Amino acid sequence: METLCPPPRLAVPASPRGSPCSPTPLKPRRGTPEFSPLCLRALAFCALAKPRPSSLGLGPGELAPRTPVLLGPPASPCTGGWAADGLKHLGGQAGRPSDVSSPAREDADVAVCPGGGEEEEGGGGFPHFGAGSCAPPGRCPAPLRPQDSPTNPAWSPPRPARGLDAASSPPLEPGSPPPSPPAGLSPEPAPSEQPVPASEAPGGGDPAPTAPEAPALSPSTADAAPDPPRDLRQEHFNRLIRRSKLWCYAKGFALDTPSLRRGPERPAAKARGAAKKRRRPAPPPPSVQPRRPVPTLPTSSTFSLLDCFPCPPALVVEENGDLGPASSLRLQGDAKPPPAHPLWKWQMGGPAVPEPPGLKSWWVNLEEL
């Protein structure tokens, strides 16, 4: 059996399986270690699972996360020990069987941190100040006095918001008195909010004088009101656009006038009307032109057949159908045609085109012979 079992390989020591977050031990590399995708995903999950900072460190646009009723946030310096004590009281209420439902827990949570709901509705603000807090945003309210501690019988637990009582708070027992608001807050509304009834008004029953209403703005005062600040860059951009070539081509070069450069104090409607008037000038009055005289028709025709020929014809057909000299058409009586007339050079049997002078007399000689 000893010969069949292979001996253990001691050359390569067995290394424990590394965690996914450890760098790969295959090749020792210089520089920053490389992490596997699983390790990076685990790191991202751990970063997301970290608790968010307290509501005091939130930016103006962040929403304060709702804290569970039983756990509660750590007491911040601006809220003192009131938030933790209120959470204990609400936790005791939540411990009753079928007494507080899940919406009621959320409402109680909102009552503990009333600023969180306001921040979620309004977006941003100071979540650690409630609606009834009179301290300005820059200061923290004073911590509770010893007589305001929960052990004091005069101390009462915090009261949820009014709008949430009727909606989702559990019905109160018939024998228990209604819970009072936290110390420092009176159950009655502020005197400025509560109107004084006519029966309790001082001065023998006369109603209290109300504040005079602001007089309505007259048209003159409305006109005299200061104009909203104008954007000089936008005006300059509009002026450049209206002076550009494309705008001028589109509008017919009528808007690039001194009236536009005068400034925006001129009403836009008047400037537009003036531009339209300049763009469409009135047509000039029609000038009275003398009419041309009606052309009179000639009594005799001016057409001449012989004038249309490039050269006077030599022979024409006479009335008897025979050929005759063309000069006979213009001759009056027994007059002879002029010596340049082709009649003198034309002979029977001769060529139609005149010959050169050297060959001119050969046919005459033939006739004589």
From Swiss-Prot:
What biological-process terms (Gene Ontology) are attached?
neuron fate commitment; regulation of transcription by RNA polymerase II; stem cell differentiation; transcription elongation-coupled chromatin remodeling
What ranges does the record give for the region Disordered, renumbered to this chain? 1-33, 89-237, 256-299
Protein's UniProt keywords contain Transmembrane helix: no
Keywords for this entry? Chromatin regulator, Chromosome, Methylation, Nucleus, Phosphoprotein
Q: Where is this region: BC-box?
A: 39-48
Is Heme one of the keywords? Answer: no
Q: Name one Pfam family in it.
A: EPOP
Q: Which parts of this chain are annotated as the region Interaction with SUZ12?
A: 301-349
GO terms (molecular function) for this protein are: chromatin binding; protein-containing complex binding
Q: Biased composition, Low complexity: where in the chain?
A: 207-225
Recorded GO CC terms: chromosome; nucleus
Positions of post-translational Phosphoserine modification:
S15, S19
Q: Where in the cell is it found?
A: Nucleus; Chromosome
Instruction: Give start-end positions of Pro residues composition bias.
Output: 1-10, 171-194, 282-296
> Where does tissue-level expression of this protein occur?
Highly expressed in embryonic stem cells (ESCs) during embryogenesis and in the adult brain.
Q: What is known of its domains?
A: The BC-box, which mediates binding to the elongin BC complex.
**Record text on subunit structure and interactions:** Associates with the PRC2 complex, which consists of the core components EED, EZH1 or EZH2, SUZ12, and RBBP4, and various combinations of accessory subunits including AEBP2, JARID2, PHF19, MTF2 and EPOP. Within the complex, interacts with SUZ12 (via C2H2 zinc finger domain); competes with JARID2 for SUZ12 binding. Associates with the elongin BC complex. Interacts with USP7.
Q: What does this protein do?
A: Scaffold protein that serves as a bridging partner between the PRC2/EZH2 complex and the elongin BC complex: required to fine-tune the transcriptional status of Polycomb group (PcG) target genes in embryonic stem cells (ESCs). Plays a key role in genomic regions that display both active and repressive chromatin properties in pluripotent stem cells by sustaining low level expression at PcG target genes: acts by recruiting the elongin BC complex, thereby restricting excessive activity of the PRC2/EZH2 complex. Interaction with USP7 promotes deubiquitination of H2B at promoter sites.
Name this protein carries in UniProt: Elongin BC and Polycomb repressive complex 2-associated protein
Q: Which organism is it from?
A: Mus musculus (Mouse)
